[in-house]
């Protein structure tokens, strides 16, 4: 163990096992309870400890919980109802989309253009936020899923949840507990995707 790791009071094997054991749980199969206010704050606090070239904080958060999930569902239902050939079943499905988990966090990417920091790096920082929040939720004993779906790209939905035209949804993080045991999916072999230069 290095001198630096000793100052953090971390067990290297336990920390690495935490990273290696993380897996997503289907948003359709999450149940309560979700994180409380303090846990939610800590998940977000962990999320923002990511690489951020230029200290721009090119992200912000929208928390959907309680009745806020139902309000979001109404927005989705209204927006999808305006689409061609939308069935009543589909409208109801969208109305319940954000009810699938106790808490959903929208991670908003808000890049600044025409500055020396590349837009791509700012967007990658938002992706790192999403991933770090998944690890934080996992460390607290929750299951989380990072997804986008159509509602991350629909202009009317984005406007109605307060996004500016220059902002994007990097992901919706669904957090809860698994309603059934999780099964890990196959992962690529490290050697098959690694080259040495």
Regions found by a protein language model. Give the residues of each.
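Short Asp/Glu-rich motifs
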Residues: 73, 156-157, 163-164
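Phosphate/diphosphate-binding glycine-rich loops and adjacent basic-rich segments that engage nucleotide
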Residues: 184-197
């Amino acid at each position: 163990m290095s001198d630096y790791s000793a100052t953090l009071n971390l067990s290297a094997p336990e920390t690495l096992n935490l990273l290696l054991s993380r897996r997503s749980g289907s948003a359709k199969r999450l149940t309560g309870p979700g994180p409380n206010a303090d846990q939610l704050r800590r998940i977000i606090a962990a999320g923002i400890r990511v690489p951020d070239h230029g200290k721009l904080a090119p992200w912000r958060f929208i928390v959907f919980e309680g009745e806020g999930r139902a309000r979001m569902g109404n927005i989705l239902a209204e927006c999808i109802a305006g689409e061609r050939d939308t069935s009543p079943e589909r409208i109801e499905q969208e109305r319940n989309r954000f009810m699938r988990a106790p808490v959903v966090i929208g991670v908003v990417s808000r890049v600044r253009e025409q500055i020396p920091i590349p837009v791509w790096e700012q967007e990658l920082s938002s992706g790192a936020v999403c991933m770090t929040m998944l690890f934080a939720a996992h460390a607290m004993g929750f299951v989380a899923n990072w997804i986008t779906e159509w509602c991350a790209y629909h202009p009317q939905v984005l406007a109605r949840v307060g996004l500016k035209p220059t902002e994007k949804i990097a992901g919706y993080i669904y957090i809860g507990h698994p309603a059934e045991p999780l099964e890990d999916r196959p992962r690529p072999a490290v050697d098959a995707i690694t080259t040495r230069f």
